[in-house]
Structure formats: structure tokens, C-alpha cells
């Protein structure tokens, strides 16, 4: 498992028993932890606020995904590496690697601008 891999991880539910396998994009792998972003195919019914945090994977088919999908950049998830069970799906294309980097910078910039605006008026 390495950065920009797409894998399926079993994620436990927080409020009930059980869980399900979810596709994630690997951000970073260290000796002890794996950092990842969730991948979703659910986009249309999300709020504008949530949608602005979703990067649309351009080369989703070559990445091994079955349908158009988005990377949820709103939260990063950390998993202990020891005993982590995963299934390889594919790898993010160079095009998507570059575009997601630009998208992330633009997202951070808009968050900073929003925070600056809030500070001015508060």
C-alpha cells in the first residue's frame, strides 16, 4: 500500500454494530499509521458546502472504480497500520494526482479567505 493507491477498507460503524467496506484514497503511509480520504459515488444530493470539498476523480475507470466517484477532502482518516485488512482497487492517475493537488490548494485558500472574512466581522 502506498500514497495515491485506492483500496477498500472495512470501516466499523460508530453508532451501531457492524460496518462495511469503503473505498479510500491513501494519502500517507508511515510505520504505524495509514492516512486516507473517503471516496464516494454520492454527490448530487449533497449540500453546496459538502460538494466544494469533493474532488471529482477524472480517470475513475482506470483507477479501478466501478462508477464516477469523488474524493472527500473534508476529513482525513487515520488507521493503525498493524493488522489493517484491505483490498487493492487501483491507483490514482498522474492527471488526477496533479489536479487533486491543485484542488486541495484552492480549497485551503478558500477556507483561509473565509476565516479571514469571519475574523473581520466578528
Outline where the language-model segments fall.
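A generic structural signal for short, non-catalytic loop/turn and secondary-structure boundary residues
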Residues: 2, 29, 48-50, 64-72
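Short coil-to-beta transition motif at edge beta-strands of beta-rich domains
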Residues: 1-12
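Membrane-targeting and insertion segments and their boundary/processing signals
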Residues: 10, 44-47, 74-77
Amino acid at each position: 500500500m502506498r500514497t495515491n493507491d485506492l483500496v477498500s477498507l472495512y470501516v466499523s460503524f460508530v453508532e451501531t454494530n457492524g460496518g462495511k467496506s469503503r473505498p479510500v484514497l491513501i494519502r500517507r503511509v508511515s510505520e504505524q499509521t495509514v492516512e486516507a480520504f473517503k471516496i464516494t459515488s454520492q454527490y448530487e444530493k449533497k449540500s453546496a458546502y459538502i460538494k466544494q470539498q469533493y474532488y471529482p476523480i477524472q480517470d475513475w475507470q482506470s483507477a479501478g472504480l466501478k462508477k464516477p466517484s469523488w474524493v472527500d477532502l473534508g476529513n482525513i482518516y487515520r488507521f493503525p497500520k498493524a493488522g489493517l485488512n484491505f483490498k487493492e482497487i487501483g491507483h490514482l492517475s498522474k492527471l488526477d494526482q496533479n489536479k487533486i493537488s491543485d484542488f486541495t490548494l484552492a480549497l485551503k485558500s478558500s477556507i483561509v479567505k473565509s476565516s479571514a472574512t469571519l475574523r473581520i466581522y466578528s
